[in-house]
A protein has these predicted regions:
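N-terminal non-catalytic accessory region
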Residues: 1-141, 145-190, 194-201, 316-320, ...
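Secretory/organelle targeting and membrane-embedding segments
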Residues: 147, 156-363
Length: 457
């Protein structure tokens, strides 16, 4: 959801406006997000009604996925690391559509950009400073779903030479094996009425191929003594579209085992993250533990024969073992939406682009995690939880409204096996929780405050 979307028929921006008031209206007004639903024409491939105009330039928010930080700092960092601003192509895409569809658009845009850059006068000058004065090649920097687009564009796209013309790919929080959070989105409200934004997202997500492409493909369905992958029938049972699930399964089967050229994965760690689920009578119960298989595909079990559980954490949305197809990762204690904005992540991007030896950022605070509600009610206390430390010494936690009208401390105290702070915000709006551990990059997450209205389906 990191691209601003524009409705060409109405002339309205339908995702990504720069104020919290728009977010509140989008998630709570009766027709707030109606324009984002895929139409029958769009499902048949007749596109053009909605266009992606640019990358997000202002914070956004969604139930379950929570805060989505803008890409201004990432684009600025990349631009400072290249020979000329014309060497950089920000690629916005309609995230409602399938990975396969957007991958085709990405492959075409990347090829055109490379050919245009190779004709640019600054390219000829830059070659004089490169080993063997070689021609410029592509480097992809991709956050979240963008990494799946890049994988599909380079390994199964229409341009068979694109991978050979690529020097490297840097992914940040990409769910290569999907995310349990996507299943939770589709299942919202199956058991009971839910907050209005959550129900609205479920109805919206049901129409979206892109959301179905983010469903977990690893063994995550807990059936007691057996753990297996979700099938299209399971996805229909939990609230998804079976046809879209079949298409998504075909995509992931095609991409499984494919390697990205020069890949480095930045992976969020230590944040509480959904990793598995049960599905009973159409209701999903998600858990913060996963399961592992031996090299022969057999499930790891304990001495009683029960499946062995592992809490590997993640970035709050994508669990650690889904965020990279290999074990070669750069771990960062950051939330998913902030992975493309934190100072440590931006330093890793700079290092990757400039081909310096990369040892990864300092890991002093790598085990600290933050947990906040995605939606709160103004005037009602709620809790920030901090995991991985047992003392508030050296920690500063604060809450501020993104628009700047409110700011205040969140005083941490000991609460069982973690720290906590009780917070109350005065008015509807988008708020940023910041936990400063003394490391270069603080932990941040966005919370939407809105009236407590229920969606009963």
């Amino acid at each position: 959801m990191g691209s601003e979307l524009y409705d060409t028929e109405s002339g309205d921006v339908v995702w990504g406006l720069a104020n919290a008031g728009w977010l509140l209206k989008a998630w709570t007004a009766p027709q707030g997000l109606r324009a984002l639903r895929l139409t029958p024409d769009e499902r048949e491939g007749r596109l053009g009604r909605i266009r992606a105009r640019r990358l997000l330039r202002t914070p956004a928010w969604s139930p379950f996925l929570r805060g989505i930080e803008p890409y201004n700092d990432l684009v600025a960092t990349v631009t400072r690391s290249v020979a000329d601003p014309e060497a950089v192509l920000p690629f916005a895409y309609d995230w409602r559509l399938s990975v396969a569809t957007n991958a085709r658009f990405l492959a075409e845009a990347a090829r055109e950009h490379l050919e245009r850059w190779r004709r640019h006068p600054a390219h000829a000058l830059a070659r004089k400073h490169r080993v063997d004065e070689r021609e410029g090649r592509l480097v992809f920097v991709a956050h979240s779903m963008g990494g799946l687009l890049t994988l599909a564009a380079l390994t199964d796209g229409p341009d068979g030479d694109l991978a050979a013309d690529t020097r490297g790919v840097l992914t940040l929080g990409t769910p290569f094996q999907g995310a349990v959070a996507a299943a939770a989105i589709l299942n919202t409200g199956q058991g009971a009425p839910v907050p209005l934004p959550h129900g609205r997202l479920r109805r919206l997500a049901y129409t979206m191929p892109g959301l179905h492409d983010l469903l977990p493909t690893f063994p995550c369905l807990d059936e007691g003594l057996n753990i297996r992958r979700l099938s299209p029938t399971d996805i229909a049972d939990l609230g998804g579209d079976k046809d879209l699930a079949v298409d998504s399964q075909t995509l992931h089967d095609t991409l499984r085992g494919r390697a990205l050229p020069g890949h480095r994965a930045l992976v969020g760690i230590s944040q509480p993250t959904l990793q598995s689920l049960t599905l009973r009578q159409g209701v999903v119960t998600a858990s913060e533990h996963c399961y592992r298989e031996h090299s022969d595909g057999e499930l790891m079990r304990d001495e009683t024969g029960a499946p062995r559980r592992f809490d590997v954490g993640g970035d709050g949305t994508v669990h650690k073992e889904s965020a990279s197809p290999t074990r070669a990762t750069v771990p960062l204690a950051l939330q998913h939406g902030a992975l493309a904005q934190g100072e440590a992540a931006l330093e890793a991007v700079t290092s990757f682009l400039e081909e310096d030896e990369h040892l990864g950022p300092a890991q002093a605070g790598a085990r600290v995690g933050i947990e906040v509600p995605d939606l709160v009610a103004p005037g009602t206390p709620w809790t920030v939880r901090v995991r991985g430390v047992d003392s508030p010494a050296g920690l500063d936690c604060a809450v501020e409204e993104v628009d700047g009208a409110f700011a205040g401390p969140a005083r941490l105290y000991g609460d069982d096996d973690h720290l906590a702070a009780r917070v109350t915000v005065p008015a509807p709006g988008l708020y940023r929780v910041t936990l400063d551990t003394g490391d270069p990059t603080p932990l941040t997450q966005l919370v939407l405050a809105a009236p407590d209205e229920r969606d009963d389906g």
